[in-house]
Amino acid sequence: MTMPTLSALQHRLAQLAEQKNEPLTLAIIEQLKQQSYQGALSAPLVQQFCQQFSLSKIELGLGCVPIAACYALTPVSHFCVGAVAIGLSGSFYFGANQEFAGIAMQQTVHAEQSAISHAWLAGEGAISDMVVNCTPCGHCRQFMNELNTATTLQIHLPHRQHNTLQQYLIDAFGPKDLNIANVLFDQQHIVLPLQGDALVQATIKEAQQAYAPYSQAVSAVALQVGEQIICGRYAENAAFNPSLLPLQSALNYRRFLGLSDVAVSRVVMVEKRAVLSHYHMSKALAETALGLTLEYIAV
């Protein structure tokens, strides 16, 4: 099983452009082409599109959601969900659901997780708004409750805008109930000893930014993608099951960097020894999604 190809993405975008046949969609798709299909819009581009089409940021985000959905990988559901995480910086980060055939359903990345992980890996400091084409499921509501902006986060749907996450997750259980002050998107203070070659060292450095306050099982994955190194990191959750594993994070980021057609030659995982491990799940996904053996280092 492989990740969706760039040609498949281009085909979906062409179909969407034909169906919509309106200036905003065409302009955004053209911009994506110019940036080699990296699924994000910088703050200056967001401002430019808002001015050009006389739209608010939220209206522009709603216009981007069907485009974000074109990045979905859905061999199981055949149902594409698109999301746009709006950073405090003003940048837009696209997300889409990522499913993996031939492996457990629990390996799935939800669209909101996809957009949030995309923003986190891109260096965004916080998320102010989440725009999505479908009502967030309970899994995603709980995942978003881990954010450092959970109390102010605004959720926007095509049929309903400007509702807080708290309106979707009443009497929520979250990190504060477990006395966690330094939450997702806050700076983490983890020190791990460096070792190994450049790919291993990149993985270790990424693991130092992982978020695992409940198990302490910080981990990261690095992919050798052509000449580039793409990393993903573990994002734990107070409810445990909505946690996002590092290989899913890395594969998702690869997709939104427009590199899904570039072969992965190595996959390395670094994990701190703790009460639990995600090695076996990650090993299975590496073999199924990439046809590669996971190189694993416990520190």
From Swiss-Prot:
Co-factor(s): Zn(2+)
One cellular-component annotation, GO: cytosol
Keyword Iron applies: no
CDD domains assigned: cytidine_deaminase
Leader sequence segment: none
KW Repeat (keyword) present: no
Binding site residues for Zn(2+): 110, 137, 140
Binding site for substrate: 97-99
Catalytic reactions on record: cytidine + H2O + H(+) = uridine + NH4(+); 2'-deoxycytidine + H2O + H(+) = 2'-deoxyuridine + NH4(+)
Pfam families from the UniProt entry: dCMP_cyt_deam_1, dCMP_cyt_deam_2
EC number: 3.5.4.5
Top EC class for this record: hydrolase
Residue stretches making up the CMP/dCMP-type deaminase domain: 56-176, 194-299
GO molecular function, one term: cytidine deaminase activity
This protein's UniProt keywords: Hydrolase, Metal-binding, Zinc
UniProt remark on cofactor binding: Binds 1 zinc ion.
GO biological process, one term: cytidine deamination
Active site per the UniProt annotation: 112
Domain of life: Bacteria
Quaternary organization: Homodimer.
Family per similarity comment: Belongs to the cytidine and deoxycytidylate deaminase family.
Function: This enzyme scavenges exogenous and endogenous cytidine and 2'-deoxycytidine for UMP synthesis.
Protein name: Cytidine deaminase
Annotated organism of origin: Haemophilus ducreyi (strain 35000HP / ATCC 700724)
The gene coding this protein: cdd
